[in-house]
């Protein structure tokens, strides 16, 4: 029966390969010791499927699997080195891809594992996750700590949660400004200069205006320079400094991943019911 379902799943998956799957959910998992964690996006065609128990269980199991088994890439097609997530075996004994095929056969929609992020720390630090709106937005955050014992302090635990919420709400692209590549900076500056010139400003003035707008760009896109969502009088960097001072231990944001369900994917606009029937 299992072999038949696998074969049926392959056939169903092939039949639905051309459909658009831009709905779905983000799931996360962090190990009890907070030393490793994962963020996963699994897509389907309609929001209805995100409420199906089998789909939700698979998406959640997959996040734990990624954290524990440490795949390097989705598949060989990515061009990156393995191990590959879709080829790895789950607790059921089926591979991730076989499980996807089985879900496609039983649910009747195209289902895809789109992407994942995995963080792990061996040095003092902490992995924090945050899922917003039932899986529409997910965040994974890595923090470095000067003193390992500070990881159990309430002030630090609250900070980790608040920073993850900050990433979810404010959509930063970088931790700090030195992470912004030169090409991006050059493009942004060129746009700002062109805008100022189009507004009738002389070139010398346009250059200064562009520099000011570049500062605004940093404040919007760099996490440490953003205004803290819970206190407009603080930047995230100042918040870090305050909590670090209270704890007597340095804190550093190492990296983060922020996934928003279906971002960058084409949306369905056709008659889904008609297609299924």
Which residue stretches match the model-derived regions?
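N-terminal assembly/interaction segments in proteins that build large macromolecular machines
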Residues: 1-277
